[in-house]
Amino acid sequence: MGLSVTIRLSVMMFVQFFIWGAWYVTAPLYLGKIGFTGADFGWTYSVGPIAAIISPFFVGMIADRLFATEKVLGVLHLLGGGAMLMAASKMQGADPSATTINLMFFAHMLCYFPTLALTNTLALHNMTNPEKEFPLIRVFGTIGWILAGWVLSWQGWDSSVRMFALAGWAAVGMGVYSFFLPHTPPPGAGKQVTAREILGLDALVLFKRPAFMIFMVSSFLICIPLAFYYQMAARTVEQANLLPAFTMSWGQVSEIFFMVVMPIFFLRLGVKWMLLVGM
């Protein structure tokens, strides 16, 4: 993989996660100011997982079969950025509606979550040695999330509507940038795809394997405290008189460290013990 492609893919990953990190963990600090209730926050952080359930159908039926990956990526980010900017606009109205704002978040997430898979597809397609090159490219996504948090705290936007504008304009910029990424034809072009494959029903047979079942149950359980973290940690950090976005970004700093040492853990501990220590 040449230097030019490496830089372009690194920038892609950086902005991809900058968008998400710019608002997702600090949103409650502003939304509480405009009247969001506990139930409203519940929906704010439920629309993302719902969109994540829906998005594979879009990727399987359209993005993987009909259009070049970089073009789909560009269109989705432009639409998602527009939805986030509309949400920011609604927040500043005379009587902001939590329902309307959450619907805008849902529209944004419906566009954003497919791009997580699409950026991976695009990156892997344009690598000559994915096993070695992908981790080095993917780490720029984590750096993007970290820098988004630092920008928020540096500018004093931890509890400002400007965090949503930052995310929206970053998504629009990513949308434009995507059209200049390396051409990546749809991986499923010309292939017959059944509804069973799109729905992932063929994968259900894996649940017959005890090891896979345990892994899925563990993944399910570990996502429960993660959901509470996203919804509540920022307010706890703020009450401790710390900079919320900056302070919470250190979680991603530790992620970079563990991404570096993970190969050592694989060799010394094996998968089972590594997962046990992590959980």
Task: Describe the role of every protein-language-model region.
Residues 71-86, 273-279:
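Structural signature of the two symmetry-related core transmembrane helices
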Residues 52, 131-152:
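Glycine-rich segments within core transmembrane alpha-helices of 12-TM secondary carriers
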Residues 148, 163-180:
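Symmetry-related core transmembrane helices of the 12-TM Major Facilitator Superfamily/SLC fold
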Residues 49-57, 145-146, 252-260:
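Residue-level signature of mid-helix packing/kink "hotspots" within the transmembrane helices
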Residues 1-3, 181-217:
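Juxtamembrane intracellular "pre-TM" segments in multi-pass secondary transporters
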